[in-house]
Amino acid sequence: MSKIIGIDLGTTNSAVSVLEGGESQIITNPEGNRTTPSAVAFKNGEIQVGEVAKRQAVTNSDTVTSIKRHIGEDGYKVEANNKSYTPQEISAMILQHIKSFSEDYLGEEVEKAVITVPAYFNDSQRQATKDAGKIAGLEVERIVNEPTAAALAYGLDKTEQDEKILVFDLGGGTFDVSILELGDGVFDVLSTAGDNKLGGDDFDEKIIDYMVSEFKKENGIDLSKDKMALQRLKDAAEKAKKDLSGVSSTQISLPFITAGEDGPLHLEMNMTRAKFDELTSSLVDRTKEPVRQALKDADLSQSDIDQVILVGGSTRIPSVVESVRKETGKEPNKSVNPDEVVAMGAAIQAGVISGDVKDVVLLDVTPLSLGIETMGGVFTKLIDRNTTIPTSKSQVFSTAADNQPAVDIHVLQGERPMAADNKTLGRFQLTDIPAAPRGVPQIEVSFDIDKNGIVNVSAKDLGTQKRTKITIQSSSGLSDDEIDKMVKDAEANAEADEKRKEEVDLRNEVDTLLFTVDKTLSDLDGKVDEEEVKKAENARDELKAAVEADDIEDMKTKRDALNEIVQNLSVKMYEQASQEQQGDQAAQGSDDASNASGDDDVVDADFEEVDDDDNDNQ
């Protein structure tokens, strides 16, 4: 059965996801981006979709954007390329583009899809969306409400109690607020409100207007009349908006934006977040009324809402987040990428349809090995596959660097020797480890699985007794098919895995050797012949060069050579130390005979032991 993809067909941007190994994976477009502009351009008889179309939205009049606003609108057509196109046809071109690069990613033909729509879409809008899919060569298995898809991606279907969820969706071109009631895994849309003429594009326009106004004040030229300049302003405004979501100010620099009487002119401007908030405050205010309306329509108050989740890239704007916080009285859940969350939920719904997503029956044995990632990306098992539960296991680990203040515990499930090839169950950190050389702190990692298959993992510093833990429920884990696949993968890749593990072990061994050599050379300073030390330093540098060159065979050769030199140095140091002790003994007076006798017993024992070692070596 071919894969069913999940598509978020957005007003400004679209995204596509597929279920792989039980998790939604966003499929990147040919430009390597995780979202694709919902734009279509016609140029020289060619249809261009996505990034390339967006870049000519201002300069090419045959470019169509935000077609989703008109889908299902009776009689509406756009004129482009000397033809008339329905919204379904334009949407189909976007879907065809998505279908094409999804097939390239999956390496197989894609025939089926789940497509999301706003909760307020009526039947004709939903049917038009299905028709667009059909035109694109896709069988639309299901039309899913965007807020429901978002809630699925946030994992809210797995909550045990009934919940009321407010979904705040501010995309590039539209704004929606939906309130869902969730009970027994069923989503019910209680109310929906919004503004389909409000989105991130409007925030961009405010910045563009400000730049045009400021440039006109300084230079007397209206950039809005220049299409090429306007396209550059549009790109710069979008970048500034994104920058100001993370930093308090950003520099807008557009050299050679236009030309005046005295030659070329440049636009240089610093924009602060405070200025951005001032320019866009009216837009943020417009998001408040739909939130209040949705609550009123659902006959709910702020206190009735259990969770608020954010959808759409524009929800990254700090002033928007603050407004949501005030209007709902809740801290918004921002744990999933807002640009991708709807597509990811659509892929989960696709998995439900194909039977890949279902409740996992808790077994009385652990289906796969459990462990943690250790130095070099190795998967160290603590509990083996098919171990009867309940069970528990502990193992002591240490730090990988001097004065390491914390350790990251990466909990994994699977059968492959390398951590990256197994499934991540969770991560947590043990902090405040007292400063000490590497290898000294004792960190005890414990796995405990109870009869319900719930995994508790803890890490304890045996020195300070400080402890942290994480709880992982197996119902969010792997299906039987995934387990079979992982076991087969482990068998099929055994040889390659073993080679990679050997390489990691070699690197760890070399790293430890280099650390030991540096310490030994420091201890030997002035105690052995300088030429011998130089020889060791050269061998050490050669090994470092082999590591940098990533030459495994050369690393082995240089490692063995360095080991031999260091061992010889150590022997010479002990011989020298023994001779010095003998000299000290001979110089002692007879008055100290009784004391010397006691000391001689110790010295002789040490000396004889060294002699034995020398004889063995000879």
Swiss-Prot record:
Alphabetic keyword roster: ATP-binding, Chaperone, Nucleotide-binding, Phosphoprotein, Stress response
Residue(s) carrying Phosphothreonine: T174
GO MF: ATP binding; ATP-dependent protein folding chaperone; unfolded protein binding
PROSITE patterns membership: HSP70_1, HSP70_2, HSP70_3
Highest taxon above the source species: Bacteria
Family: Belongs to the heat shock protein 70 family.
Expression triggers: By stress conditions e.g. heat shock.
Alphabetical list of Gene3D superfamilies matching this protein: 1.20.1270.10, 3.30.420.40, Actin, Chain A, domain 4, Substrate Binding Domain Of DNAk, Chain A, domain 1
Biased composition (Acidic residues): 598-618
Xref: HAMAP family: DnaK
One Pfam family, short name: HSP70
Annotated source species: Tetragenococcus halophilus (Pediococcus halophilus)
Purpose: Acts as a chaperone.
Keyword Coiled coil included in the entry's annotation: no
Family matches, as NCBIfam families: PRK00290.1, prok_dnaK
Protein name: Chaperone protein DnaK
Stretches the record annotates as Disordered: 573-618
Bias kind Low complexity: ranges: 576-597
